[in-house]
A protein has these predicted regions:
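Charged, compositionally biased boundary regions
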Residues: 1-171
Length: 171
């Protein structure tokens, strides 16, 4: 429940970053980005029946690494083509799971910033993987309210997104 997800961070001595639920929701509100939407449309999806699947998965993992490095260095990215590639490749479970697995104590704040930004600008149909990654990072940081609201955002985008449904049962 909302009370439980708010009480957990407080009980751990972590103050809530937003004065109310509206502030939290405003911080993750979607923002349309037509350039990214157009780039995403132009990137070929992975065809699992054709050859080259691993090459495209590797391309996705490397794009995640490059974007994370850019966020670590600059706190943002202006490379909308790279962002679009990450969004497209996160539809692949291997790439998404890789992205989830690279979060560490050392980079969790960078990854939080990156996933939040991508979740806000992702076009419809591409929000669920990023929102789920953002949710997992928030859960690791002890922010149950943000983790829960991020999962809700993922399920609004794709109501049957398996990882979001699983994490919703976990927390």
């Amino acid at each position: 429940t909302g009370v439980q997800t708010c009480a957990l961070p407080i009980s751990m001595g972590k103050p809530l970053p937003f004065p109310n639920l509206e502030g939290l929701l405003e911080s993750i509100k979607s923002e349309s980005n037509e350039e990214i939407k157009n780039f995403v449309k132009k990137i070929k999806p992975i065809n699992y029946k054709a050859e080259g699947v691993r090459v495209l998965q590797r391309e996705g993992a490397l794009a995640v690494n490059d974007l994370a490095a850019e966020f670590a260095e600059k706190g943002m990215s202006g490379d909308n083509l790279l962002i679009a590639l990450v969004l497209k490749r996160l539809l692949d479970l291997q790439v998404r799971d890789y992205a989830m697995g690279i979060v560490s104590e050392e980079n969790i704040e960078t990854m939080w910033q990156m996933w939040r930004h991508l979740m806000k600008i992702a076009p419809s149909g591409y929000i669920a993987p990023v929102a789920t990654l953002f949710s997992a990072v928030n859960y690791e940081r002890g922010d149950g309210a943000m983790a829960t609201k991020s999962l809700e955002k993922a399920l609004e985008d794709q109501p049957n997104y398996p990882l979001a449904k699983l994490l919703k049962r976990v927390y």
